[in-house]
Curated annotation (Swiss-Prot):
Its main location: host cell. It is a peripheral membrane protein. ATP binds at G690, V691, A692, G693, C694, G695, K696, T697. This is Replication protein 1a. GO terms for cellular component: host cell endoplasmic reticulum membrane; membrane. It comes from Broad bean mottle virus.
Length: 966
């Protein structure tokens, strides 16, 4: 049945005045009127899809809530969300200030924004000033195509060009500039308005902070943006960095942005342009530039600029880096300076050394610019100074007091007649002033004719430079211009391309609608002789076409785009693990560099041993090796690398270097480099997911085939346990070391090819780590043994986000019978899983063959001295701090180092262990989330065969172990 209605036939048959036709006309008229009303109101409605905080929502509504119908949908998280939301509203605000039917030019704006709103009166000048602008055009093209394919509204070509604003020939009376003034400046905007066709009024917005005129850096708190001025003169720039954002920052010439703060008028020919700063809200300034050709008489303009209480501050000059040739301005509260001067002047003693007077000034300055605690309440006295500038401000204020004191004394002295010589000096040399930065006639004449004469004070020629430190900043602020050629060549190309994109997208949309319409048109009642089996048989017997065969064949080129989701997932996991390993190496280098600097290590000497002593008390693995071969502290650990000015790496006996716990096995960089060379394997992954004590190590031993298999473990201790289980006394043999390896060793040094890869405690491995090993050994199957509910892979960098750390398996075999755990542990774990709402856990149905009925107990202790050390027991802790305390306790009672290392571990380290007697020790009642962790508590409760004793000091909220152990 056709989907189209023949109106002419309907009218001829039924009549134009029939009720149905009348309703159709009325409905269509209503729809058109509704559409027109919605279009007229579109400029009054602002849809903001960014997620905003409560404070940001309030600020946005306070700024634009009255002028527009603000709709905050909170759909997605966007970088610098408030700034982006404000920018959308700024477009509406600026455009709404002009006549609704007049042409408007947008200097540097987004043509897609106006096109999506259907506002055809706005022409956008979008020059490509760098890679960012070029890539923005690419992104807009993608979004343009998406809009055209999903809506019938977009049929016209966007109205924009790639010309700079001053080169654009589009005629319009009005212009807008939304955050484009950073690259053009006030005078640049005036030139763009003037040539080639004059535009009457421009309205724009720009980020604004009055402190930019005085400070070198500052913050726009509501926008979460920091700004910093760098460089000097014509090369000075201002940088904007959004706090806690990963997006690109912004760098602009200071002279362009500064012009909006310092300039007010500019004339070109007979046209005068006036800058009017209209409104400052949310650290965004809305301004207007108005052009006039009217002959204007001279006038002194005074502009009220919002410097947010800037008049309450004084500029104090302080030296930079103890260099008397370089000074900077520091803002100090006017009240603080005046009170310091008032009190200090009363304490000023001429017979004192200047340092004594400076101490008095510093003491008073501290009292007037610090936090005072009275009756337990903090009261701010004055305004706090930067701790790095406090002493220099005190120094400058002291010199200022000396200067004022000397001025008064000289003034008093000049009141007395001291002869013609003194009269000559004060009148002709100093122009009647005893102290002046400007000389008199004679002094200026000599300085001009004989410039090499030293007519100023000794400070002008004093060269006193103290170089304290060098700080290098790695910055990438520019890209070679040649890179831009890969984006667009000519303006005609991009305009033609936009038209082509619209035609292509519209054609595809129309074709899709026609195809859907055809499907409905062809849908008719099937004849009686029609049978569904005929269609099935026809499809089955239809030969495969050549096109289909080509699509099924493998690509001939080596560089092919990976479209298989499984391959994409595996490549992502490997790359993530490589990046994670690289991050660990960078963290190690950064920490050691910081330690090296704090210790004051230079050359062959360490200048600040107290820092080393402090760090060593916290971590006894921190040590310093001297060039004479001795260590600062007795050597108790083995280190493979060290750090000094030569970087992190192997060191010689005659070098000075520092070490910490990461230097015992620093292999992260080697692992990262090796992972970059592997690719995603095609082998299958079978997960043997067994409960604690189900005999995973025994299963590995029975499954292992020497000729075909290789075993990989998560850590060195697991590898030693597996070697002992399989090879017995020959666990240190070359063969055992070759076929049973740790994952890190396999990645760094490689391993033989095999048919099957067996993995012990697979849950402790990163998925990318397991895949890298599988690719290196070219196996066809990975048999991973582990427990998906015990402790999994944990990142050692809290800031590194993991996406692929959990192992993805093709098949999972569940083992729910334990041979190790006593019966009361089985019951306790079942309750634990139910309390944690883990209804799908395999532990809900696990059973035990153990004959031990009662094993769990707990006791309260008040100190570590109540922990008895018994050689037949295994001691567990949740934290490294508790473990270190237990190790010290064991050494105090005379237990040897070998026993301590083999019988005291953290719960994380003990995963996979099986012992008869376990003692879990908690020495503090401070917050520890590990005792609330389901996986950590599961591991702790399932290590023993016979007894489990929980020794705890104080009550801890949410302690799952204490809850289930009675």
């Amino acid at each position: 049945m056709s989907s189209f209605v023949n109106l002419e036939s309907l009218i001829s048959e039924r009549g134009a005045n029939c009720r149905g036709a009348d309703e159709i006309v009325n409905n269509e008229t209503t729809r058109i009127l509704t559409s027109q009303i919605e279009h007229s109101q579109r400029s009054k409605k602002v849809n903001i899809r960014n997620k905003l905080s409560v404070a940001e929502c309030d600020a946005f509504r306070a700024r634009y809530g009255g002028a527009f119908d603000v709709n905050l949908t909170h759909e997605y998280t966007a970088p610098h969300s408030l700034a982006g939301a404000l920018r959308v509203a700024e477009h509406y605000d600026c455009i709404d200030s002009f006549p609704p039917e007049d042409k408007i030019i947008d200097f540097g704006g987004s043509w897609l924004h106006h096109y999506s709103r259907g506002d055809s009166r706005v022409h956008s000048c979008c020059p490509i000033l760098g890679p960012r602008d070029a890539t923005r055009h690419e992104e807009r093209m993608c979004r343009l195509r998406k809009m055209v394919q999903t809506s019938d509204r977009f049929v016209d070509v966007p109205d924009f060009c790639l010309n700079k604003a001053e080169d654009c020939n589009v005629q319009a009376d009005w212009a807008i500039c939304i955050h484009g003034g950073y690259d053009m400046g006030f005078q640049g905007l005036c030139k763009a308005m003037h040539a080639p066709l004059e535009r009457g009024i421009l309205q724009g917005t720009i980020m604004f902070d009055g402190a930019m005129l005085f400070d070198r850096q500052g913050e726009l708190p509501l926008l979460q943006c920091r700004w910093q001025r760098v460089g000097t003169g014509s090369k000075e720039q201002i940088k904007f960095d959004f706090i806690n954002e990963s997006t690109l920052s912004y760098v602009h010439d200071w002279k362009n942005l500064g012009s909006f703060l310092t300039e007010s008028t500019y004339s070109i020919g007979g046209t005068t342009y006036l800058l009017e700063r209209m409104l400052l809200k949310c650290s965004i300034m809305t301004y207007k530039i108005i052009a006039t050709n009217v002959r204007c008489p001279p006038e002194s303009l005074r502009h009220c600029i919002w410097f947010e209480n800037i008049s309450q501050y004084l500029a104090v000059q302080i030296p930079i880096g103890y260099n008397l040739n370089d000074w900077k301005t520091v803002r100090v509260a006017r009240a603080t300076v005046r009170e310091v001067e008032e009190i200090s002047f009363r304490c000023f003693k001429e017979n004192k050394d200047w340092t004594e007077n400076m101490r008095s000034v510093a003491s008073i300055l501290s009292a007037k610019s610090s936090t005072v605690i009275i009756n337990g309440q903090s009261i701010m006295s004055g305004e706090r100074l930067d701790v790095l500038e406090y002493h220099l401000v005190a120094f400058s204020l002291t010199l200022n007091l000396y200067q004022k004191y000397e001025k008064l004394r000289n003034f008093q002295g000049e009141l007395e007649w001291k002869g013609w010589a003194n009269h000559f000096k004060t009148r002709l040399w100093w122009c009647g002033r005893t102290v002046s930065t400007e000389g008199g006639f004679l002094r200026n004449f000599l300085a001009d004719k004989i410039p090499w004469l030293k007519l100023n004070t000794y400070a002008d020629s004093l060269d006193f430079i103290t170089k304290i430190s060098e700080v290098e900043s790695f910055e990438v602020d520019s890209v070679p211009t040649s890179r831009l050629r890969s984006f667009f060549q000519k303006e005609e190309n991009i305009v033609e391309r936009a038209a082509s994109e619209i035609m292509s997208a519209n054609a595809r949309r129309i074709a899709k609608k026609a195809e859907m319409s055809k499907e409905f048109d062809d849908f008719v009642d099937a004849p009686e002789e029609f049978a569904p089996e005929d269609v099935v048989e026809e499809v089955i017997n239809t030969p495969v076409t050549q096109d289909v065969k080509l699509r099924q064949s493998k690509p001939e080129t080596a560089r092919s785009i990976v479209l298989d989701p499984d391959a994409v997932l595996k490549n992502g996991a490997i790359n993530e693990f490589a990046d994670y390993s690289k991050r660990l190496h960078e963290n190690t280098v950064s920490n050691l560099r910081h330690l090296w600097t704090l210790m004051g290590c230079r050359g062959n000497e360490i200048h600040n041993k107290s820092v080393a002593e402090t760090y060593h008390r916290v971590d006894d693995m921190v040590n310093v090796h001297f060039p004479n071969g001795h260590w600062m502290y007795p050597l108790k650990y083995e280190y493979t690398v060290g750090y000094n000015d030569g970087g992190l790496g192997e060191k010689f006996e005659n070098e000075l270097y520092v070490v910490d716990k990461t230097c015992s096995c620093a292999n992260a960089k080697a692992i990262a480099d090796a992972c970059k060379k592997v690719s995603a394997p095609t082998c299958s992954v079978v997960m043997v997911d067994g409960v604690a004590g189900c005999g995973k190590t025994t299963a590995i031993k029975e499954t292992f085939r020497f000729e075909k298999d290789i075993i990989v473990t998560a850590n060195r201790k697991s590898a030693e346990d597996v070697r002992k289980a399989i090879f017995g006394d020959a666990s240190d043999s070359e063969v055992a070391l070759k076929v049973v390896r740790t994952a890190d060793s396999a990645i760094m040094h490689g391993l033989p090819e095999c048919h099957r890869l067996l993995v012990d405690e697979a849950g402790l491995l990163h998925y990318g780590q397991l895949l890298a090993v599988a690719d290196l050994c070219k196996c066809s199957e990975v048999l991973a043994f582990g427990d998906t509910e015990q402790i999994s892979f944990k990142s050692r960098d809290a800031t590194f986000r993991m996406k692929y750390c959990n192992i993805e398996y093709d098949k999972r075999d569940i083992v729910s019978k334990t041979f190790r755990c006593p019966q009361d542990v089985v019951s306790a774990v079942k309750i634990l899983k139910r309390k944690c709402a883990n209804r799908s856990s395999k532990y809900n149905g696990w059973v035990s063959s153990s004959k031990v009925e009662k094993s769990l107990s707990k006791s309260r202790i008040v100190s570590i001295n109540q922990v008895s050390m018994e050689k037949h027991k295994f001691y567990l802790t949740m934290t490294e701090a508790d473990k270190a305390a237990l190790c010290s306790r064991a050494k105090d009672v005379g237990l040897d180092k070998t026993w301590v290392e083999s019988n005291m571990e953290t719960v994380h380290e003990a995963q996979g262990k099986a012992v008869d007697h376990v003692v879990l020790v908690r020495l503090k009642s401070t917050k520890c989330d590990l005792f609330k962790s389901e996986e950590y508590c599961l591991v702790a409760l399932t290590r023993h065969k016979r007894t489990f004793e929980y020794l705890y000091n104080g009550d801890l909220g949410g302690d799952l172990i204490s809850f289930y152990v009675t």
